[in-house]
Amino acid sequence: MALTILGLSGALSHDPSAALYIDGKLIAAAEEERFVRDKHAKNRMPYESAKFCLEQAGIKPSDVDVVAIPFAPISLFGEARWHYAKRYWYAPDRALDAILMGNRRYKRYRNKIVWCLEQLGFDPKKIKIEPVEHHLAHASSAYHCSGFQEKTAILGIDGKGEYATTFFGYGENGKIHKIKEFYDPDSLGGLYGAITEFLGFEMLDGEFKVMGMAPYGDASKYDFSRLASFENGELVINTDYANVIGLRRYKEKGKGFYFSPKLIEWLGPKREGDIADEPYIHYAASMQALFEKLALQMIDHYLGDILKDTGKLAFAGGCALNVKLNQKIIARDDVKELFVQPASGDAGTAVGAAAYVSHARGVPVEKMEHVYLGPSYSNEDVIAACAKHASKPVWRKIENMPKRIAKIMVDGNPVAWFQGRMEFGPRALGGRSIIGCPSATGVADRINHQIKFRERWRPFCPSMLDTVAPQMIKVDHPAPFMTFTFEVSEEWKTRVPEVVHEDGTSRAQVLKREYNPRYYDMMKELEVLTGNGVSLNTSLNRRGEAMICSPKDALDMFFGSDLQYLIMEDILVVKDGVDPYDSLG
């Protein structure tokens, strides 16, 4: 009888998601935000995403053996709750709460999950809910999905889970062993988030903007070492400045921030607006440099011996999306291969919790080869959505879609690209993307003007054929998920300038045809036309919105922007007066 496990995340009041394993195979996974059209879906439960997973598998709630959740009760007899209370002594209400009522959030979350499951048709008397510690779920999402057979070092860094903020361990023969954890407020991810807020961005959304701003600054201009240290095996955040709660927080316009007024006294007012200007570009560079330095020191201390032995590292948690750190990690002599869970944030813990429970029950999970795990739609679905849409889109079904789209792109036009199953995780990887020809001068600016309106200093990224990668990027390392940056060779910097960042790197997706044949074939056509089998690729959404899920979402976005071309499966939609390239057949 098949072992069916539904993973549900959402305990930390953001990024709820669902994932479904049947006999170790990941059948479906999706974030709630995509269905409810609310980025991060804060304070929601994963109802729509769980419903999709069940429908995708063609099963009923009664077919599910276990519901795995990535949040667990933490014992009073361990270190975590006492560490929290000691370090937050200046907020006695929080400190006492950690000691006396330290699992209140877990109980509240579990009750909400039960309610959500009841709405889905689960029998509350028969539901088997299995909690997995948050950082164990992150660890499982990295290690168990990596496909590594050797002893594997495991790293988890995020803001925080129940109390833990950082996880060091190893996986061997399918079992995860914990070496060390750090606890709130000693959180490298929390510190990065605090500086993200100081630099004028939102936590959860803005960290990658700080990373993108950093190459424009000079880290040597400001010494951020007072903010955090790693000595004698312990990470300590200076809570005079950051990772603060209660009355210690800096407040502005009724909002409390994760840093203190003392940070303002030291660095000046928090940044406002979209311009990458001084001194803030230097602050971004200094934060990124400190983050990399401390993370690499911690890896050395706790995982160095394992890496020297086997060279395999699995990494998850929100900070695993810091591609500049990942570039430094794979440059280490003792790292042969780094697997970064593509959904490294909290959404990925639905996969991790389910994978952990599957292994615990004796059913190993398959290697995660791709992220095309969400809904897909047929040409008929697309045509029906066009017929119902208020904007009355003009559409045509086209032959040889990859060839026509490549020609449209080569002429400098961005294209909204909607093909196959939606991606799981924050990266658009050729399922729900806005694409452009990276050798067409100004295409990045056109994408910004037509839809993205993003800060121009933020880089656009390339997808490329697996045959192109050895020529364009200098490191031979698997890169299917845009979780690494690579140095771009000098020749290719001039061939595809629209996807090369200020520091000469690109955050690349290297695609094998078997996982997304239509996207691959389109890039092959680009290669025929331009000599470059590379596409500019950014997520299919407007600024501040969740990535597109359905044809209706795509049409709403298309007619709410200045984009001229939308391809959904074989259905091409163009704006009035725009050349549909019908002469190509």
Per-region residue spans from a language model:
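Phosphate/ATP-binding catalytic cores across multiple sugar-kinase/actin-like superfamilies
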Residues: 285-311
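Conserved hydrophobic/aromatic pocket- or pore-lining residues that grip, position, or stack substrates
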Residues: 195, 295, 318
